[in-house]
Amino acid sequence: MNYFPWLTTVVILPIVGGSLIFLFPHKGNKVIKWYTICICLIDLLITSYVFCYHFELDDPLIQLTENYKWINFFDFYWSFGIDGLSLGPILLTGFITTLATLAAQPVTRESKLFYFLMLAMYSGQIGTFSSQDILLFFIMWEFELIPVYLLLSMWGGKKRLYSATKFILYTAGSSVFLLLGILGMSFYSSNEPTLNFESLTNQSYPVALEIIFYIGFLIAFAVKSPIIPLHTWLPDTHGEAHYSTCMLLAGILLKMGAYGLVRINMEFLSRAHSIFSPWLILLGSIQIIYAASTSLGQRNLKKRIAYSSVSHMGFLLLGIGSISDTGLNGAILQIISHGFIGAALFFLAGTSYDRLRLLYLDEMGGMAIPMPKIFTVFTILSMASLALPGMSGFVAELIVLLGIITSQKYLLITKILITFVTAIGMILTPIYSLSMLRQMFYGYKLFNTPNSYFFDSGPRELFISISILIPVISIGIYPDFIFSFSADKVEAILSNFL
């Protein structure tokens, strides 16, 4: 057995390394940037090493567990561990954060604080995905909100304070339900709190109480995912945030809500999930069509991409609600797939804004000729977003739909209706994606602003784009890489529903 605290190292390294940034000279933006990238790279390499040499793919149990008594008063442990459900989001977090740090090169105002906040956010996200104590999970969940709020409120558009305030009101408000659910579950059986994930998995509750807990957790995770009607903070936030922050929001933060739904609502509250799963299916179907239709009406480029993210999150609900092996594996694949695609689209939207200083699609046009590289990469990743065969988005959405069709829980007529409604959403997706490409890159040059700089993608931007494009295509061609570490865990979760 390996006793080295790998997961504690991965969680602590970014924030400890980030704290040293404030010791750097005041005028050293390049040094600070490359130092931050090195911290992210080292953390990602450690995570990759642990995955390659210390993680057993065919073991559905929690691995690399670390338990350190933190507070004796109520049996609170610093407890970490990973399994097939958390490994993918952890690797995704390291990868996207490293690229987002590289994408943040144009940020020069208060750069020390900016990069420290990115690293603090990194620690909070890794801590959330690897926590094996439900109170530690809550602490990491809340800790991560602080750097996000500061990144939103200090760097971005003119309405950044409004969007940051809206974000914190939604997320902090929903955290009240999360805390109440945690306290209720922990203190149900005795005066001694039960905080360990393994103990909570084996805990049973009266059905009525389990439903109450389920609703509380669902509200908390619905805000982060986001699920309609608790999604309205997302377009405003993406519309105002700096694009490196948007990469972290779309690539990682939204996945925390989906992870919570599977980890807590499905694994701990299986009876309540069986009751609510048809409603999740209905909500997911409505969300796919509603968000796709709303995206088509958005003039703001970043808001259009934000609504497309909301639409794609609807497939997660379908997979989670299907209660089938295929559907849940598809939902986990969608978490990873959309993490890459969403982050890439916001990065490319940001690079376009850096050149044009425009965000409204009806003010753009004819960008394909002066910027052919940006045009090519933007087109390919938009095709990935609309689920072109050979891309990760296609495989994820197809497997989710197969999960619905093969589910034993629903009648044939229900499956046909769900598939029909989802197909409408899949038709709307290319409409708003191709419309966006047409308005940006084709036609006559509509913009004529003195602050525009017509130069194509540089080496840094090409590197980031290609780095994200490679896994999108790789997963689309060989999705079994993701299933190799999620399949056994999915079987273990679904065994609670037999």
Swiss-Prot record:
Signal peptide: none annotated. GO terms for cellular component: chloroplast thylakoid membrane. It comes from Glycine max. It holds the Pfam family Proton_antipo_M. InterPro entries: NADH_Q_OxRdtase_chain4, NADH_Q_OxRdtase_chainM/4, NADH_UbQ_OxRdtase, ND/Mrp_TM. Belongs to the complex I subunit 4 family. GO terms for biological process: aerobic respiration; ATP synthesis coupled electron transport; electron transport coupled proton transport. The chain crosses the membrane at residues 4-24, 31-51, 76-96, 113-130, 134-154, 167-187, 208-228, 242-262, 272-292, 305-325, 330-350, 386-406, 411-431, 463-483. NCBIfam families: NDH_I_M. This is NAD(P)H-quinone oxidoreductase chain 4, chloroplastic. It is found in: Plastid, Chloroplast thylakoid membrane. It is a multi-pass membrane protein. It comes from the Eukaryota. It is an enzyme of class 7 (translocase).
